[in-house]
């Protein structure tokens, strides 16, 4: 099985309505390019630009059952293509940073909210938002077959536990909406993460010149060794440039599954009985 993943590396337009319309157009372009899954960058509803005053923040947020999100559910069914739509979600006591994954039938497979919010003690950080409290993995039905998918959002990448938890829940592919500079070290994180837990990671970022973003959406397939190769291979099978665009990359799921069955990374030699300190707080 091979899946085509569309990275909607787009510049937001401004208003919710304009972003919705531009997102719809991009999804049609993704379908024209043969995509099975389309992923947006982080918090597409507002372009990851949100007010910090409480009343304005609440006004900016949208419901996961409201017209903005519902339109992309309908579009997923219309296009026979899974869509991972991102938005500032209405929630109590505070809004959340959320991605909803709809399958090709328009059914919501999960609604995941960012677990590790960017609370850096800065005026423009995410301290005004609520954090999510779990990671989800679902069986996503595509026209090519079923694949187990989960999501993490931007800063979640910085914590190895995020991807590890979803690997232990059976994930084969992680969809990662993003809004930050994807420079050498952050890209290296993804290289390492895909290698150490043997899964694919698809990250969609905003293009330049969006504030503090530089494109470089990527797909890592997680397959480091092949029997016919004398040495390791590069797991980065796609990297966009800085510019805006709808980019499509292919993931060889059968190759990944065969590799996971053959190799020893990931789960095989884990010893969770000695990892207890990992789930405790503030040891540094």
Language-model features and meaning:
Residues 90-169, 178, 185-192, 199, ...:
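Active-site catalytic loop in hydrolytic enzyme cores
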Residues 1-6:
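Extreme N-terminal starter segment of soluble prokaryotic enzymes
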Residues 248-284:
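A short C-terminal boundary segment appended to hydrolase-like catalytic domains
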Residues 64-82, 157-247:
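CN hydrolase (nitrilase-like) catalytic-core segments centered on the catalytic cysteine
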Residues 16, 25-105, 109-111, 180-197:
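Cys-nucleophile CN-hydrolase/nitrilase-fold catalytic domain and related Cys-dependent amidase chemistry
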Residues 114-128, 243-259:
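A short, polar/charged loop-to-alpha-helix boundary motif
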Residues 9-16:
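Short polar catalytic/cofactor-binding loops
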């Amino acid at each position: 099985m091979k899946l085509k993943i569309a990275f909607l590396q787009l510049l937001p337009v401004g208003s919710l309505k304009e972003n919705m319309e531009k997102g719809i157009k991009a999804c049609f372009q993704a379908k024209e390019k043969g995509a099975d899954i389309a992923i947006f960058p982080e918090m597409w509803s507002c372009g990851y630009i949100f007010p910090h005053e409480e009343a304005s923040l609440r006004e900016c947020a949208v419901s996961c059952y409201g017209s903005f999100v519902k339109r992309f559910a309908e579009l997923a069914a219309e296009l026979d293509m899974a869509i991972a739509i991102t938005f500032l979600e209405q929630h109590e006591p505070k809004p959340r940073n959320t991605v909803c994954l709809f399958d090709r039938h328009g059914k919501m497979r999960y609604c995941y909210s960012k677990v590790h919010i960017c609370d850096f003690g800065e005026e423009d950080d995410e301290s005004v938002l609520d954090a999510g409290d779990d990671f989800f993995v679902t069986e996503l039905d595509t026209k090519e077959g079923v694949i187990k998918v989960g999501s993490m959002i931007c800063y979640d990448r910085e914590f190895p536990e995020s991807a590890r938890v979803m690997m232990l829940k059976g994930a084969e592919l992680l969809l990662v909406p993003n809004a930050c500079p994807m420079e050498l070290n952050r890209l290296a994180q993804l290289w390492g993460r895909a290698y150490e837990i043997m899964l694919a990671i698809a990250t969609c970022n905003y293009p330049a010149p969006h504030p503090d973003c530089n494109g470089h959406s990527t797909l890592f397939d997680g397959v480091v060794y092949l029997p016919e190769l004398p040495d390791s291979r590069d797991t980065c099978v796609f990297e966009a440039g800085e510019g805006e665009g709808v980019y499509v990359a292919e993931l060889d799921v059968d190759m990944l599954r065969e590799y996971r069955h053959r190799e020893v990374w990931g789960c095989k030699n884990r010893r969770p009985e000695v990892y207890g300190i990992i789930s405790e707080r503030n040891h540094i």
